[in-house]
Amino acid sequence: MKILALKRKEQSVIPGFGLTFGISLTMLSILILIPLASILVYSFRLSPLEFWKLVTEKPVLNAFFTSVICSFIAAAVNCVFGVILAWVLIRYDFFGKRFLDGMLELPFALPTAVAGITLSKMYSDTGMVGKYFAKIGIKISYTHVGIIIALIFVGIPFVVRAVQPILEKLDNQYEEAAYILGADGKTTFWKVIFPEIRPALLTGFGLAFSRGLGEYGSVIYISGNSLKEHTQVVSYVIMQKLNYVDYPSATAIALLMLVISFILLFLINFVQMNQFKRTNNV
C-alpha cells in the first residue's frame, strides 16, 4: 500500500490535472479553435463550385504562386545562412557574440510594418543599399527580389533557433574522430554533422516557409502589390477582399491557406516524431 501511495504521489500534478487542462483547453478554444471554426462554418455556406471558382481566379492564383515560390526560396536561403550563423554562434567566441545572438530576436520583436518600411526604403533605387544595385540595372524594391529579402528577414530566426540546440549538444569528438580517419571538412560536415542537424533544419525550414506564406506587414511595403508585375501576395489579396467587403472570397482563400498551414505543421511534427523514435532506438 505504501508503494502504491508513493506512486500516486509521484503522478500527482500541482495544481491538478483537471484545473490545468481546463485552463489550457479554454485558452486554446478562445485563441485558436473558435476563430478557426468560424472560418470553417462560413466556408460551408459556399458550394464546392463557388469555392473552386473563388480560389482559382487569376489574381488569386498569381498571389499563391508568388507567395509559395518566394517563401520557398527565402526558407531555402535561410537554411544555408541559418546553419552558418548557428555554427558561428555555437562554435566560436568573439567580441559582440551576445549582441549578434540578441539581434536574432529583432524580427520577433520589431513590428512587421516597421521592418517593411525600413527594407523598402533601404533597397529602393535611391536607398542606402538599393542605389548601388540600381547603377547596374538591378531593381530590388517592388519586385520579387524585395519580397524574398523581406521573408528572409522575418524567417532567419526560426532556422537558427532550431539548429542551435542540436549543434550545442553535438560533441566535438565526432568531428575529431572523422578527422583522424582522414575525412576532410566537407566530408565531415555532410557525413557527421548534417545527419544530426537535418531534422532540426527541416523544422526550421517548415516554420520559416509557413511564416513567409502568411506574412503581411513586412511584405506589402516592399512588394509594390502590382497586378501587372505579379507582386501581390496571398495575405494582401485577403486583406483587399475584406476591404471590398467580399467575405466569401476572403474566407475561401483563408481556408485554403489554413489547409496548407496544417499540412506543413503535420509534416514538421512527423519529422520530429521520426527523429525522436530514432534517438530512442539508438
Task: Tell me what each language-model feature is.
Residues 136-179, 205, 266, 270:
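Membrane-cytosol interface at the C-terminal ends of specific transmembrane alpha-helices
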Residues 12-16, 58, 216-267:
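Interhelical loop and adjacent transmembrane-helix boundary motif
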Residues 10-12, 95-99, 144-146, 170-203:
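Amphipathic cytosolic juxtamembrane alpha-helices at the membrane-cytosol interface
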Residues 2-4, 12-15, 19-23, 31-34, ...:
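C-terminal transmembrane helix and the adjacent membrane-cytosol boundary/short C-terminal tail
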Residues 9-14, 18, 39-76, 91-92, ...:
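Periplasmic/extracellular loop-to-transmembrane helix junction in inner-membrane transport proteins
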Residues 22-27, 106, 153-155, 159-171, ...:
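Transmembrane alpha-helices
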Residues 3-12, 72-104, 117, 121, ...:
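Transmembrane-helix boundary motif in ABC transporter permease subunits
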Residues 4-10, 48-56, 61, 97, ...:
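Membrane-interfacial helix termini and adjacent extracytoplasmic/periplasmic loops
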